[in-house]
UniProtKB/Swiss-Prot annotation:
Short name of any one Pfam family annotated for the protein: Helicase_C
Motif (Q motif): 138-167
Protein name per UniProt: ATP-dependent RNA helicase dbp7
Keyword annotations: ATP-binding, Helicase, Hydrolase, Nucleotide-binding, Nucleus, Ribosome biogenesis, RNA-binding, rRNA processing
Matching CDD domains: DEADc_DDX31, SF2_C_DEAD
GO terms assigned for molecular function: ATP binding; ATP hydrolysis activity; RNA binding; RNA helicase activity
Length: 709
């Protein structure tokens, strides 16, 4: 009998019929888990390829992500090539996202081009009478000022009449009752001269034998920032540049300057000593030649900021030391027979009241009768100041700022832009001055090359209009650069516009002449900061305008400003679309070509950053610092400025970055990693430790920006 034939069944192995291999029990559990994940991933990829084959070529299953985002790497950069012709390798994680789609909060008006003048801030004036202007109905003779000093003010300093706060302070401080004084006045109302004029007038009435720099220190003036100290020093020098008081010598002691030079000036003799609390305390402790036994006036300028910046303990030590060293011998003179303390502040809040209670005794309360008090006791902004705000989606912030500047550089000669951190100042400075397209490169060639290694603090704003100059100022710059930048910006009188990018280091006390517009690109960290920022314009009776950028989730901040500082602030007509159309439209047109031009401007900068690694690093640092600074808003305002409401991808877009936020932060991470790639988190911290760390970091930020000491 023949053998039965052998039948063999062959089954073709494919992805769908393949079963996972049995895992060996002898292997480690981590290896088995890794194998399961790999098998699951291979199975998913196989199913995706099957769906793709079944879909055919009719284009019915278009990849949604590819329709929304274009991945590019190392684009072929040509500054003269239109944005839509950009070619790139599609293997990177960078994205080109649109500015004008996908955000319901944009609310673009379709008829903004019909009346471009309505989008101009300068087109809308105010008819209110200036609340900080010199009083025309009086003169300095009517407030007991010496005739020769009044003539000097009129002829050399172009000041013909006192302001309201000066009219209030001069008679009281020239009086021989010699009481302590609390001076409260609006920003830009002339507080510096309100206390300097009485000091100088009473010093010039001293006997002739005391008219020398070696007769002693008669006045000590403290201010929170180096820039404000330098400004007070300059005003004192101008005031004393006359035959009556030419012998009065002022000295400025601030951080960033050589202590050896300051000690040499003190040894030669000083009559008015001006300084920051930190540096002044250092000299009181370590400079033997500093004799404060004859001090008759102690002035605390910007008292609210002195307290906010953590100077309370330092101020207490300084005041106690001055009191202990006081040994006034000659009392029958024109100067006070006791040490008189004056506290100046634009706001009257709890911290200032606490300082007033400890530093002042039986003090006079001096305040302009023009200023009306709010319910909370805070002072208002000048009446003639036009205040606006605009709600801008995060990805449109950069082009909206550029549009605002482009539409106003012709009518406004000096513009100040406040940002939240120094890294953001550096980014916008570089973004505005860089040469990208052919016209900008041609303008850049005309400029003289800077010497290698120099830090540039001012340059032509090629990305705005080429005719304007842009400046930067923040606490990380050296004192020499900060001083020269302020001097250049203040003294500039040419036909072009001048734009100062700065942090809050320039928000307090600085009297920058003829500032027409203040832009708060980043919201202030407190309502007091808002008041002082806008106080850089509309000073001494001049008109001025201020506009603040807010994100859609931050609009509730307007109600807080109205209730806390009585801000008379209005919304900018037509919102961001009005700004963009005014800045990017060519002529009066009804078309929306401004959207294309704004997009082109943004994409040109993005391509430039992709090709330029140093600029890309600057943008990354600015993004990271902005997010960190955003987290330092007051706890009472945390519901308005909530970190969870930030769209980090759109915020990155406002810094011209195409990388995902996670990739940006990862590039800057310096945390040690364990073997295997996990981050060593270390010991977890309690909520109290984290809160204390945040407070300490905030104070370090203040110290850096304002250069304490």
């Amino acid at each position: 009998m023949a053998d039965e034939p052998l039948l063999l069944n062959f089954v073709v192995d494919n992805a769908q019929s393949r079963k996972p291999e049995a895992l060996k029990s002898s292997r480690r559990w981590t290896d088995r888990a890794r194998d399961r994940k790999r098998q699951k991933r291979n199975s998913n990829e196989s199913s995706k390829s099957t769906v793709k084959r079944n879909s055919g070529t009719n284009g019915a299953s278009t990849d949604y992500k590819n329709s929304q985002k274009e991945k590019v790497i190392n684009p072929v950069f040509d500054p003269r090539k239109p944005a839509h012709e950009l070619k790139g390798n599609k293997r990177d994680n960078t994205f080109v996202t649109s500015l004008f789609t996908g955000d319901d909060s944009e609310h673009f008006s379709q008829d903004v081009g019909q009346n471009l003048e309505d989008n101009q801030i300068s087109n809308i004036g105010t008819t209110k009478e200036a609340s900080n202007a010199p009083i025309k109905t009086t003169n300095f003779a009517g407030v007991q000022l010496d005739t020769q000093l009044a003539d000097h003010l009129n002829n050399k300093m172009n000041i013909s009449a006192p302001t309201a706060i000066q009219s209030c302070c001069l008679p009281a401080l020239l009086n021989t009752d010699d009481k302590d004084a609390f001076i409260e006045a609006q920003t830009g109302s002339g507080k510096t001269l309100a206390y300097l004029l009485p000091i100088v007038q009473r010093l010039i009435r001293l006997p002739k034998n005391l008219h020398t720099r070696t007769s002693g220190i008669y006045a000590v003036i403290m201010a929170p920032t180096r820039e404000l100290c330098q400004q007070i020093y300059n005003v004192a020098n101008k005031l004393n540049n006359n035959p009556l008081s030419h012998w009065i010598v002022s000295c400025n002691v601030i951080g960033g300057e050589k202590k050896k030079s300051e000690k040499a000036r003190i040894r030669k003799g000083v009559n008015i000593l001006i300084g920051t609390p930190g540096r002044l305390a250092d000299h009181l402790e370590n400079t033997e030649a500093l004799d404060v036994s004859q001090v008759r006036w102690v002035v605390l300028d910007e008292g609210d900021r002195l307290m906010d910046m953590g100077f309370e303990e330092t101020l207490t030590k300084i005041l106690s030391y001055l009191e202990s060293q006081s040994s006034i011998i000659k009392k029958d003179l024109s100067i006070p027979s006791r040490k008189v303390t004056m506290l100046c502040s634009a706001t009257m809040k709890d911290t200032v009241k606490r300082l007033s209670d400890s530093a002042l005794k039986d003090a006079l309360y001096l305040k302009s009768s023009i200023v009306e008090e709010t319910n909370d006791g805070y002072s208002q902004a000048p009446e003639q100041l036009l205040q606006r705000y605009v709600v801008v989606p995060p990805k449109l912030r950069l082009v909206s700022l550029v549009a605002l500047l482009r539409s106003h550089v012709r009518s406004y000669k000096k513009i100040i832009i406040f940002l939240s951190c120094s890294d953001s100042v550096d980014f916008h400075f570089e973004a505005f001055r860089c040469a990208i397209n052919a016209d900008e490169m041609e303008e850049a060639v005309k400029e003289k090359p800077d010497s290698e290694g120099d830090i540039i603090s001012n340059a032509p704003a090629l990305r705005i209009d080429g005719k304007s100059n842009v400046y930067r100022l923040h606490g990380s710059l050296s004192q020499q650069i900060r001083t020269s930048t302020l001097n250049l910006f203040s003294s500039s009188e040419d036909s072009g516009s001048h734009i100062l990018l700065c942090t809050d280091v320039a928000a307090r006390g600085l009297d920058l002449p003829n500032v027409d517009l203040v832009v708060q690109y980043d919201a202030p960290f407190s309502t007091d900061d808002y008041l002082h920022r806008i106080g850089r314009t509309a000073r001494a009776g001049h008109n001025g305008a201020a506009i603040m950028f807010l994100l859609p989730k931050e609009s509730e901040y307007i109600n807080l400003l109205k209730s806390s500082v009585s801000a008379n602030i209005l919304e900018q007509p037509n919102g961001p679309s009005g700004l963009l159309s005014a800045g990017f439209s060519q002529g009066k047109t009804n078309t929306n070509d401004w959207q294309d031009r704004a997009t082109e401007w943004q994409l040109e900068l993005e391509r430039f950053i992709l090709e330029n690694e140093p600029m890309r690093n600057i943008a990354k640092r600015a993004f990271t610092s902005y997010v960190r600074a955003y987290a330092t808003h007051l706890s009472s305002e945390r519901s308005i400025f909530n970190m969870r409401d930030l769209h980090l991808g759109h915020i990155a877009k406002s810094f011209a970055l195409r990388e995902a936020p996670g990739k940006i932060s990862g590039a800057n991470s310096s945390k040690p990693r364990k073997q295997g790639g996990s981050v060593d988190k270390g010991k977890s911290k309690s909520s109290k430790d984290i809160a204390a760390l945040m407070h300490r970091k905030a104070m370090e930020h203040y110290s850096t920006e304002h250069n304490i000491g």
